[in-house]
Every structure is written in structure tokens, then in C-alpha cells.
Design a protein with these regions (language model features):
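Terminal-region recognition feature
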Residues: 1-157
């Protein structure tokens, strides 16, 4: 038995994930003077140190056992080095559904058994960094209070 078909599909999905929300959405994002989530990560972390977790999570549509479309999750999560210190980080990908998730996040993938990036940071006792890009709320408010809001859910870092 050979795994060529399955390996080919994984490679294809990886290429689709790296295209984020597609060329048009990336172009619109850049025209607004904004960096994409992957560009922000690349500029923030030590060179070539980012290790994305669960990069193939997303929403696939199949017709007759053939994948016709794939939308990646709207959050890019992983581990990296910042000034040679290991950190966990998350960046909202605004090119995918305006940064809004639809249940296809690293925390909800795989029957809910995986730990979220915030839980991984807590377990490993490393800093957790969020690279925010928001459509709502006031960033000025975050500046004024000197922090962001506390995350919802069962994980608390």
C-alpha cells in the first residue's frame, strides 16, 4: 500500500493554508497598509524560528471524494523564539473570514482533545503573545488600560 495520494493531499492543503484568505483578500489587506498575520509573525520572531501548530485545520468541501475548496482557520498559532526566548503566540488572520473563526480553531479541532495554545503556554511556563488585528473594540482603550481583556473560556493564562 502506498500513501502517495494522502501525502499529496497534505502538501496541497499546506499550500492552500499558506495562501491564507486568498490573493484578493491579501491584496485588500496590504492596500490598507496592514501586514498579514504571517508577515507580522515573521517580523516579530527570531528568523526561521516559528513552528506552527495544527496548520492544516480548516474547513474542506468535498464532491465525489475530491476536495473542491479549503478555508484555513482564522488564527495562526505556534511556538517561536523572541530574542532567543521560547514563546507561544497567536495571530488572527484577517484575510480569512475577516479574522472570525467558525469552530475550526486549534482549540476545537480533533474532537476537542487538543490543548489550546494558551494552555500549552501555561503548561510549558512560557510567555503567551497575541498579535492582535481587530475589527471591533478600541485599541486606544487597550493602550489606556495597559493590557488587553481577559480571554473567555476555560483556559486562563
Amino acid at each position: 500500500m502506498t500513501w502517495e495520494k494522502e501525502l499529496s493531499e497534505l502538501k496541497s492543503r499546506r499550500k492552500l493554508v499558506e495562501k491564507m484568505g486568498g490573493e484578493d483578500n491579501i491584496k485588500k489587506h496590504n492596500e490598507r497598509g496592514k501586514l498579514t498575520a504571517r508577515e507580522r509573525i515573521s517580523r516579530f520572531v527570531d528568523k526561521n524560528s516559528f513552528e506552527e501548530i495544527m496548520p492544516l485545520v480548516g474547513e474542506s468541501i468535498y464532491e465525489n471524494d475530491t476536495q473542491t475548496s479549503f478555508t484555513p482557520k482564522s488564527s495562526i498559532d505556534g511556538f517561536a523564539l523572541v530574542n532567543d526566548r521560547r514563546v507561544a503566540l497567536s495571530a488572527g488572520d484577517f484575510t480569512v473570514k475577516g479574522g472570525m473563526g467558525k469552530g475550526a480553531s486549534s482549540a476545537s479541532a480533533g474532537l476537542g482533545q487538543e490543548k489550546s495554545i494558551t494552555q500549552e503556554a501555561l503548561i510549558n511556563l512560557i510567555p503567551y503573545i497575541r498579535l492582535l488585528d481587530s475589527a471591533g473594540g478600541s485599541v486606544r482603550n487597550f493602550e489606556k488600560i495597559g493590557r488587553t481583556y481577559l480571554p473567555d473560556g476555560n483556559s486562563f493564562v
